[in-house]
Structure formats: C-alpha cells, structure tokens
Regions:
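N-terminal glycine-rich phosphate-binding loop and ensuing alpha1 helix
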Residues: 1-36, 48-50, 55
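Glycine-rich, basic loop-to-helix element that forms the pyrophosphate-binding segment
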Residues: 60-67
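Short aromatic/hydrophobic "clamp" motif used to bind/position activated sugar donors
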Residues: 77
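Conserved core of the sugar-phosphate nucleotidyltransferase
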Residues: 87-165, 169
Length: 231
C-alpha cells in the first residue's frame, strides 16, 4: 500500500473497476496486514468486492497464483502485479480475452507513456508472438542481439494475464527456477507444452506505471496526479 497520494493499491483496484471488473482477490503474506486493514477498515471499496488469499511463504509468482485457487470460481480470471498500474483499457482488453491470454505492451509506449528509460524496458521479458496472434514464448532478459530485441516493434510482458483454472494444474508442476522461485512464466510454458493450452496475445500501445522501487514514487505520483481512485 505504498502511498502516491493515496495508497497505490487503490489506484490498481480502481483501474480494474473502471474496466468493469467487480471481484478482486489480493494475495498477501501471512504477516501482511496493511492491505487487509486498509480495505476492510480504513477505506472499504465501493465499486468492487475484495477478498484476500494468503501465500504462506514468498515462493514465487506461480505459488502466489496457486494460493488464490480457492478464491477463484470456475471461470476465466486475470492475474496482474500489485505494484503496476495498468490503464483501464488494458485491463478491459485482458478481461475480454475470456480464456488464456496475455496483454503485451509496446516497448516504445512504455518509454513514452510511463516515463521509463529504454534500458529498463529492455530488461523486461519480451513476448514472441506467432503469426496467428498466439503466444510462442516469453524471453526473460534477452541479449541485445536476440532477434526479438532487434525488431522494430518490441512487445513486453508486464504480467497482465488472463487464465482459465487449468493454470493451477500447471502451477503445481513448476520446479524452482535458477533464482529458487516458482515462476509463473514456467507455469505458462508447462500449460502450453504439456497441457495443450493456447494463449492469445493482445497488443497494447500504452504505458504501465511500475512502482517496483522507492525511486519510482516521484514519476508514478506525477502520472497519477489527475486520477481519483474509486476502488
């Protein structure tokens, strides 16, 4: 709930509400009472219903998604980072996928509309999109000479996903990565390779505000100055 005028999560949830999404599940750690306290006591939401799922240990993004399995009905659902502000139009595009899919953001738009420097953007994962608009692969931190990095249009994953409940079976199969974490990207790979799942990619030419670090507060606060969150 890092503040940028109002707690940042208010802006994130408000964008989802603007996109027509009324049910939100926030995954928290066992000691993370700040979000629970904020949304249940200090500032209850008016446009959404917020529930909480607990991830017992910070084992990675695939484990965080798996922790929410009991809170998700048997219908497609979105997964997104709580430290990113996605434009409502991008959230709406993700919701309209209606199955497995990913919203990919144009690298140049992240620089132009989100105030990120080019070097930072190119450290994000690049999306390899097949000719039919489906996901072929995601490349984490590609080398500068990688063909994806050399393309005129580069598409970046900012972790705005649409999933069916089949993703939970894939999350269960994930093994720790080189970083020792259970990565959501690996669950997606398993879903495609072993479970026969196809992921549609929606291209979005807009910025995503990233509040991963304290140093981001100034830029994010400036960009959200005219936004009044109404979660």
């Amino acid at each position: 709930v890092m503040p940028v005028g109002r707690p940042f999560l208010e802006y994130v949830v408000s964008a989802l509400a603007d996109a027509g999404i009324g049910e939100v599940v926030i995954v928290v750690g066992p000691e993370s009472g700040a979000a629970l306290e904020h949304f249940t006591r200090a500032a209850p939401p008016v446009r959404t219903t917020i529930r909480f799922a607990v991830q017992d240990q910070p084992r990675g993004t695939a484990d965080a998604v798996f922790a929410a399995r009991d809170a998700v009905r048997n219908a497609p659902f979105l997964v997104l980072n709580a430290d990113n502000y996605y434009p409502p139009a991008a959230c709406r595009a993700a919701a309209e996928i209606g199955g497995n899919g990913l919203v990919a953001f144009e690298a140049d738009a992240l620089v132009r509309d989100a105030g990120m420097d080019t070097g930072r953007v190119l450290r994000f994962a690049l999306v390899d999109i097949a000719d039919d608009g489906t996901l072929r692969a995601i490349r984490e931190k590609p080398a500068p000479d990688d063909p994806l990095a050399q393309r005129a249009e580069r598409w970046v994953s900012m972790n705005l996903w649409s999933f069916t409940t089949d993703i939970f079976a894939a999350c269960e199969r994930v093994l720790p990565s080189a970083r020792g974490e259970l990565e959501l990207q690996d669950a997606v790979t398993i879903a495609m390779r072993d479970l026969g799942q196809t992921f549609r990619v929606v291209r979005e030419r807009s910025g995503v505000l990233d509040l991963s670090h304290r140093a981001d507060v100034g830029v994010v606060k400036e960009r959200l100055a005219d936004v009044e969150p109404r979660p």
